[in-house]
């Protein structure tokens, strides 16, 4: 275990109210990443509790409450709560009778979150960290979004007002866009939050189709178009994707066209574009080139201090240290010889060692000692390269010098009512299982309104772990999936655990075996074996309030 490692609570822990934040503070965590559905009013109060608060501010969001989506695991056997979401919410759905929705068939697909204009409210509240979704996004996307937020933060602390310019907003939309909303964070309603028409990147509209002939589409542009831009024509039964490899204007091949120009672009015919359809730009090569130039001109480099020793009869030695105290030392394979003619100068050593090549470092301080020696540049370069490589390894490894630490949990063992589901081949043994009714605490309790007055209760999240319940069992919504999680919940007062519905028989057996081997007794555990499974907890109703049931096009849902 790592007693000095800072602990952060993931959004998948479904911490969405003040009692959850208070509980995790008392557990010694450094930071809580709140559920993405948490409104600003609760965030403001959470920031006063005395633990760092991190909030989602930009990027893809889920329609289900954070940590409460079982649809991906149910349909694709991939846990959305453990980083393997199959994105079932981005699929097409119809009513059970097969009829379609007038707003679009992507009824579960939300727009992306973008609260850049609301940033002062979050900073005023005391939020410590802004979380920006960037999984599987290109580096240019990360650069542009981070640059935008960095500029906004700097303006805020300069006591000025920041608004995203129309040009920057356009750039963000070109990078990735399926609509923006303020989400639940600032109380956008369901019509403002959903992207039912399309679930994927739509970019910006740049023109309208005039005609299609012989593998070319004629378009009147409303914005700039550059050669090799990525394009999409909104079409049915699916959109037409293309690249502006060849652009013709007045029968001449050009590499750029501007608003109001009429151009022909080579275009696939499946499906063939029709007059009046909208042309959208999904990749802007001009923007990407600008970002690449910015990244090269203003690289983010890590400052280093460097020392060297160049003494006769010893290996050449280089020591580097970063601002966080990581240190690396490298020595040459050969021994330094005394100079027979002109000795290498310290200026030459400094010039050679100051080059960092492909490593993201900047030498801000360099000094050392050198005698009258012969030292080839190749040896200086190789020793410097080794030192930087070792520093890379040191920075990527969390090192603790505290020695082996004991690890112990005070488990609430209840031996007279122990119950275990044992999986042997295809049989299930329910001997000694007790069957009784238990009250299930609300999965969503933002305002801490629910007061427990029951002796037997199913708790829904860590927000309910307060050691005041007489007899509580962790419900499937807590998504407990390994022996350590079981032990922790039992140590906090739970008398039993219902395994996550994402787990199969073999996974349950492995968790129980590991628990028994580690702690020496069999925990009281349950598993859902009959009844309808809740696959999503959604904060409010669909856009169509008359919807009672939906189905996907593959009859899996």
Region annotations inferred by a language model:
Residues 18-27:
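Alpha/beta enzyme core
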Residues 1-15, 19, 33-129, 136-557:
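Active-site pocket-lining/capping segments in soluble small-molecule metabolic enzymes
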């Amino acid at each position: 275990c790592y007693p000095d490692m800072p602990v952060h609570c993931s959004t998948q822990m479904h911490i969405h109210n003040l009692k959850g934040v208070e509980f995790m503070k008392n557990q010694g965590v450094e930071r809580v990443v709140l559920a993405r559905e948490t409104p600003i009013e609760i965030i403001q109060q959470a920031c006063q509790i005395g633990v760092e608060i991190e909030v989602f501010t930009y990027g893809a969001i889920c329609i289900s409450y954070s940590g409460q989506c079982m649809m991906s695991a149910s349909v694709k056997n991939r846990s959305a709560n453990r980083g393997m979401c199959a994105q079932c919410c981005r699929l097409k759905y119809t009513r059970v009778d097969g009829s379609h929705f007038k707003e679009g068939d992507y009824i579960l697909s939300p727009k992306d979150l973008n609260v850049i204009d609301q940033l002062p409210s979050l900073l005023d509240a005391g939020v410590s960290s802004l979380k920006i979704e960037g999984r599987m996004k290109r580096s240019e996307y990360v650069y542009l979004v981070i640059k935008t937020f960095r500029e906004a933060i700097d303006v805020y602390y300069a006591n000025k007002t920041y608004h995203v310019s129309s040009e920057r907003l356009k750039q963000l939309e070109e990078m990735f866009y399926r609509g923006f909303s303020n989400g639940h964070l600032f109380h956008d309603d369901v019509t403002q939050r959903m992207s039912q028409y399309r679930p994927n990147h739509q970019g910006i509209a740049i023109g309208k189709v005039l005609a299609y002939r012989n593998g070319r589409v004629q378009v009147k542009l409303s914005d700039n178009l550059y050669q090799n831009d990525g394009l999409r024509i909104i079409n049915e039964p699916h959109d037409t994707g293309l690249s502006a490899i060849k652009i013709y204007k007045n029968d001449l091949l050009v590499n750029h066209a501007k608003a109001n120009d009429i151009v022909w672009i080579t275009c696939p015919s499946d499906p063939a574009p029709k007059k009046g359809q909208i042309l959208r730009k999904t990749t802007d090569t001009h923007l990407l080139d600008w970002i690449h130039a910015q990244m090269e001109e203003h690289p983010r480099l890590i400052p280093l201090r460097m020392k060297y020793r160049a003494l006769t009869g010893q290996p050449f030695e280089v020591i580097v240290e970063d601002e966080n105290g990581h240190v690396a030392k490298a020595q040459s394979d050969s021994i330094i010889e005394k100079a027979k003619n002109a000795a290498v100068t310290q200026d030459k050593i400094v010039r050679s060692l100051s080059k960092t090549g492909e490593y993201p470092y900047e030498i801000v301080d360099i000094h050392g000692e050198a005698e009258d020696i012969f030292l080839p540049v190749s040896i200086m370069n190789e020793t410097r390269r080794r030192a930087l490589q070792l520093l890379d390894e040191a920075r990527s490894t969390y090192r603790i010098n505290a020695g082996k630490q004991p690890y112990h949990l005070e488990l609430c063992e209840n031996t007279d009512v122990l119950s275990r589901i044992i999986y042997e081949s295809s049989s299930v043994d329910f001997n000694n299982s007790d069957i009784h009714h238990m009250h299930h605490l609300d999965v969503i309790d933002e305002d801490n309104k629910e007061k427990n007055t029951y002796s037997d209760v199913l708790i829904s999240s860590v927000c309910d772990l307060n050691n005041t319940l007489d007899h509580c069992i962790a419900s499937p919504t807590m998504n407990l999936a390994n022996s350590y999680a079981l032990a922790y919940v039992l140590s906090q007062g739970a008398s039993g655990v219902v395994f996550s519905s994402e787990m199969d028989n073999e996974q349950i057996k492995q968790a129980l075996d590991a628990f028994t081997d580690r702690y020496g007794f069999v925990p009281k555990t349950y598993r859902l074996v009959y009844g309808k499974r809740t696959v999503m907890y959604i904060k409010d109703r669909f856009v169509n309030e008359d919807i009672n049931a939906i189905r996907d096009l593959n009859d899996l849902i």
